[in-house]
Amino acid sequence: MKKIADEIPAYAYGTAAIRPSPVSLEELERLKISAGFTAEDEQFLRMAGEVLAGQTKQIVDHWRGRIIAGIPHLAKHSRTPDGEAIPEYLAQSNLRFEQWILDTCLRPYDQDWLNYQQEIALRHTSLKKNRADGVTSTAFVPFHDIAAFVAVINDTIKSYLAAQGNTAEEVEGMHRAWCRSLQIQIALWSKAYFDVAKTSNEW
């Protein structure tokens, strides 16, 4: 499995530190069906992983430096409550963001992957945000902002999928598979927010 660095702070994929997902593998399979995700999409995601592997830093810099940084209500989630930058936090979370790209494309969607989807979601809610990096920032990232920003991620990723000379058909296939995967991931992340909603409105 490709990793963007030998050491990725607070990246604990597949370890005992990650608790089991409340979503079952059977439910994951049903989500795949609902999203139209097929074995062909798995193949296209593997292709996408190879195409994107050398571009992850550029992609994350694009998302965070050129887009999120210019949207105050999104940028504040990696800053102090007073709006000051936290460079170390940004650097560490950027590495995890890069690795997430590869995990989306190259990891098998098995129990470890399912468990880590729950961990990703929890780290955006008040239950776990800021803990992994030991910082003081916003208490949570509202779910609606995450769900909405997926549209930007899906739109901007396409040019990177096309950057290595693949055919138009291959680029379309990779992009379709990527979008379906993110639809599944957003559905999975919503579970943590629904659970938190019993005590806190983090929509």
Regions found by a protein language model. Name each.
Residues R46, D61, A168-E169:
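Polar/charged alpha-helical tracts
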Residues M1-S34, A163-W203:
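Short terminal or interdomain "cap/linker" segment that borders an active site or interface and mediates
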Residues L31, A53-Y160:
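Heme-based O2/NO sensor domains and their adjacent alpha-helical segments
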Residues E26-E42, T80-A85:
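Low-complexity, intrinsically disordered or weakly predicted helical/coil tracts enriched
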Residues A35-M47, L127-V135:
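Short, charged/polar, low-complexity loop and linker segments
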